[in-house]
Structures are given as C-alpha cells and as structure tokens.
Swiss-Prot record:
Listed name of the protein: Interferon gamma-related
Tissue: Strongly expressed in spleen. Also detected at lower levels in gill, kidney, heart, brain and intestine. In immune cell populations, expressed at highest levels in peripheral blood leukocytes and at lower levels in splenocytes, granulocytes, monocytes and macrophages.
Cell compartment(s), UniProt: Secreted
Family: Belongs to the type II (or gamma) interferon family.
Keywords assigned: Cytokine, Glycoprotein, Secreted, Signal
Classification via Gene3D superfamilies: 1.20.1250.10
Binding partners and assembly: Homodimer.
Length: 166
C-alpha cells in the first residue's frame, strides 16, 4: 500500500519538475520549429535503434508494449495528483479500519468501525475514475522491463508516446 503512495508522490514530483521546465532553461523546445527539429532528431535516433534491434519487420507491427494504455489516455477523465492521493489515502484508511475491526474486542467498537468504514467506502466511490487510473498504473508498472521482446516493442511505440507526452 505504501508503495502505491510513494509512486503517486513520485508521479506528482515528476509532473512538478516538468511543469517548472518551462520557467528557466527549459530542456523542451519553446517554438514549433524547435519542436519539429527535436521530433526529427528523436525519430532519427529511434529509426537507427529499430534497425539495430531488428524491429522494423512486419512481425513487429502492432506489438507496441504500451499501446493499450496509450489509446486509453483520450478516454480517461482528467485526474489530478490530489485526487489520486486522496483515493490512495482512503484506500489505506479502509484497510487500517478493517484490521482494527478484526482486532476489536467489543461489539460497540466493531459497530463504530463498520460505520466509519461505510463512510470511507462512500467517499471512495467518488474516486472511481482514479481507481481505474491506479489499475492502469499498476499494469504499466508490472511490465517486464528486462524482457527483450518487450524492450523492442517499447522502442517501436516510443514515437507515439513522445508525441502524446510532448
């Protein structure tokens, strides 16, 4: 559970870093011409890598590692870091209260914890979209990054990812 929370903090920190890049000494290009030049450079590097790793053949067509996740970006409602954190905290709180209820010795305490857990569940219902995003993040996090076939698929899908992330 704490790993999920750490991942949210990391994602939020990365988003903050990227948002600050535009203020001083940005690494990302500022004009359309700069963007086109950077995309051209990246495309040339990717094509060179695709040749090196032999991923230009038709057998690699449609073998993108992240394509299912990329296509879902447009269908997702926008989630904020705050709402992801709140959902995660509510989830952990629910787990804590379940454990406390299991250890409770008297019925009054068990009933109170059950009632509070009902409130937590009602609050979590507000964050159903965030829960879907969490599942997506877990799926992405579980990708076997050391698998050669997956690495080649990631190479082939990078330009799409680059364009969407830009």
């Amino acid at each position: 559970m704490y790993c999920r929370l750490n991942m949210v903090y990391l994602i939020c920190a990365l988003l903050l870093i990227v948002s600050l890049q535009g203020t001083v000494g940005a690494r990302l290009p500022q004009s359309q011409k700069d963007k086109e030049q950077m995309l051209k450079n990246v495309r040339e590097k990717i094509e060179s890598l695709q040749k090196h790793y032999h991923t230009t053949g038709t057998e690699w067509f449609g073998k993108s590692v992240l394509s299912s996740h990329l296509h879902q970006l447009n269908s997702k409602a926008s989630c904020t870091c705050q709402s992801l954190l709140l959902d995660s905290m509510l989830n952990i709180t629910e787990t804590i209260f379940q454990d406390m209820r299991g250890k409770a010795e008297n019925e009054e305490t068990k009933t109170s914890l059950r009632d509070v857990m009902t409130e937590v569940k009602m609050l979590r219902h507000k964050y159903s979209e965030e829960q879907k995003v969490w599942r997506e993040l877990q799926d992405i996090h579980s990708v076997e990054v050391n698998n050669g076939k997956i690495q080649k698929g990631a190479l082939n899908s990078f330009l799409i990812l680059y364009d969407l992330a830009y």
